[in-house]
A protein has these predicted regions:
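Juxtamembrane and boundary regions of transmembrane helices in multi-pass small-molecule transporters
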Residues: 2-3, 20, 30-34, 38-67, ...
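Short, amphipathic, aromatic/basic-enriched membrane-interface segments that mark the entry/exit
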Residues: 44-50, 66-76, 168-176, 217-221, ...
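Helical membrane-embedded segments and adjacent short helical loop/helix-boundary regions
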Residues: 47-57, 74-79, 92-101, 131-149, ...
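Lipid-exposed faces of alpha-helical membrane segments in multi-pass integral membrane proteins
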Residues: 52, 56-63, 81-88, 103, ...
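Structural signature of hydrophobic alpha-helical transmembrane segments
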Residues: 53, 71-81, 138-150, 200-204, ...
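Flexible hinge motifs at transmembrane-helix junctions and intramembrane kinks/re-entrant loops
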Residues: 70-75, 85-103, 286-293, 316-321, ...
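Membrane-embedded alpha-helical segments and adjacent helix-loop junctions characteristic
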Residues: 99, 103-218, 376-377, 381-454
């Protein structure tokens, strides 16, 4: 019987992507030295820019605190100041996201300690201030994210997601058109079982690069660009389709539960979002075939390479079989939430993780999980929820919504017009964010406040959900999403190639949002 994976010899190999990276060709020592000097200069410039942004964030914080804001008490002003600080930190990446998250929590706690409680007229105090700053850490959504990260780590520990990807590509064959469809299909299948966009991209990208290399083409070939961008964009598309596919969805669900008093089951999300993702997947195929013309329409030896890699993996291990059983059972429980049973997605996922960590019947031990789970993501997630709740509870989100959207008379517009304008704003502001989780933390509270002013069904639930779908748009630039950057790091495509596919995908995605809002989502009562 196969033993559970431990941290001693069966670690997933994070260098799989690096195996396909090739150094830039040089024609002489002089050019190589010049390139190195240029890279150092660019690095220094970025460092200076981050330093400026770091101090600018604190300057913005102080400025918002000092400027009188009519209609907002001082705690609301602190919330607004923290939002300004967070946005500058997140957009500039002056410090890493986890570091900025810790700073946000600490600053909220310190400022509230000395701030006056608008209800009592006394200082809020250290205990209550810290409780408000840490409120996001007690959200059930944080527990779900932690469990989802553990599930993604288990997939990497066993290599099950890679085996699944290889099986799909084996059936895709050697025609490029079929492999493109296969890359999309892999992203769809993995979205159901791997709750991490980066992990899904990390499973597929090395395999596709290996197929290109087997044909004798370099990493920077058009064929590489076609396949890698297809897989990456498909990951972003299905971040929308599946509730558990991306952390930013769980941010939105957490705010909806806490502030709107409504729960969104896994099945409900699928019913609402899957039609958009299915239509976008079809559009993705045609956009990619139009945007990038590969050097060849057939990869000779591609199937043999996939079969060889499957043979090297050997038969399914006991850990893989157990993880398959756990993942299928988990999916079944997710899909039947509030239909066959009342158990929440978070509870089910935590139980599944407990089973995965149990000796003999599990698939990994705690030491392995501790070393490989991205705990920074969890801290960013919880801090983002704390900030969002702070904005909503103090009325700062409502004030910001009124000032941002009230001036254009959004509340008096037809719902389709409101969705069109806010979605466009959402897409444009995403250009400044590399993390959709941070973007959701900043915008969803504002959208919840805005939804309360609109004449829409379900108290504006559908409006907020649709804006969360748009937050998942990461099609335009490599820096728009972590999975994009992972793929971009292989050197398989340029920013220009990515943008060439991203512009039509963003336009189509936006138009589909409006089409479904006017038809399908209206028919089922979402909007």
């Amino acid at each position: 019987m196969s033993t559970a994976v431990s941290g001693n010899g069966n670690d997933p190999k994070p260098t799989a992507l690096q195996d396909h990276q090739q150094p830039a060709p040089t024609t002489g020592t002089g050019k190589s030295t010049a390139a190195g000097a240029g890279a150092d200069a660019a690095k220094n410039e970025r460092g200076k820019g981050k330093t400026v942004a770091f101090f600018l964030a604190f300057a913005a914080l102080i400025a918002v605190l000092l400027i009188p804001i009519p209609g907002l008490d001082y705690t609301g002003q602190i919330a607004l100041a923290m939002l300004a600080f967070a946005v500058i930190m997140w957009v500039s990446e002056a410090v890493s996201y986890p570091v900025s998250a810790v700073m946000i929590v600490g600053l909220i706690a310190i400022m509230l300690t000395f701030a006056e409680d608008p209800d009592t007229g006394k200082a809020i105090g250290a205990s209550k201030g810290l409780s408000i700053a840490m409120s996001g850490f007690s959200s059930s959504a944080v527990a779900l994210v932690a469990a989802a990260l553990a599930l993604a780590t288990a997939m990497q520990a066993t290599g099950l997601h890679r085996r699944l990807a290889l099986y799909v590509l084996k059936f895709a064959g050697e025609k490029v058109s079929h492999i493109v469809i296969g890359a999309i299909a892999i992203s769809i299948i993995l979205a159901f079982f791997v709750p991490s966009a980066t992990a899904r991209a990390g499973a597929v990208v090395p395999i596709l690069l290996g197929m290109v290399a087997a044909f004798g083409l370099p990493t920077e070939s058009r064929l590489s660009a076609l396949l890698i961008i297809t897989a990456t964009q498909a990951v972003s598309i299905w971040n929308v389709g599946i509730k558990t596919a991306a952390a930013q969805n769980l941010v939105a669900v957490g705010f909806i539960e806490d502030q709107m008093g409504k729960s969104v089951s896994w099945g409900q999300w699928l019913l609402w979002a899957a039609p958009w993702s299915i239509l976008m997947s079809i559009a993705l195929y045609f956009v990619m075939r139009w945007a990038i013309k590969p050097e060849t329409e057939s990869i000779t030896g591609g199937r043999e390479l996939v079969e060889k890699q499957l043979a090297e993996m050997g038969p399914m291990t006991g850990a893989e079989k157990r993880l398959t059983a756990i993942a299928v059972a988990l999916l079944a429980f997710w899909a039947t939430e509030d239909i066959l049973h009342p158990i929440s997605s978070a509870t089910i996922t935590i139980v599944a993780v407990a089973i995965m960590l149990t000796p003999k019947i599990g698939v990994m031990d705690w030491k392995y999980a501790q070393e490989h789970i991205n705990w920074g993501t969890l801290i960013v997630f919880a801090a983002g929820i704390s900030l969002g709740k702070f904005l909503l509870d103090t009325g700062a989100a409502t004030w910001l919504s009124e000032k941002t959207f009230g001036a254009i008379g959004l509340s008096s517009m037809p719902i389709i017009a409101a969705i069109a304008l806010v979605s466009l704003f959402n897409i444009l502001i995403h250009l400044g964010f590399a993390s959709a989780t941070s973007l959701a933390s900043a915008l969803i509270p504002v959208f919840i406040a805005l939804a309360s002013t609109l004449d829409v069904p379900n108290g504006g639930l559908g409006f907020v959900i649709i804006q969360q779908f748009v937050i998942c748009f990461g099609f335009l630039l490599p820096v728009s999403a972590p999975q994009n950057m992972l793929a971009y790091g292989t050197g398989a495509f340029t920013s220009k190639q990515f943008l060439r596919t991203g512009i039509p995908l963003t336009i189509i995605g936006y138009l589909l949002i409006l089409l479904l809002a006017a038809t399908y989502w209206h028919w089922i009562g979402l909007v």
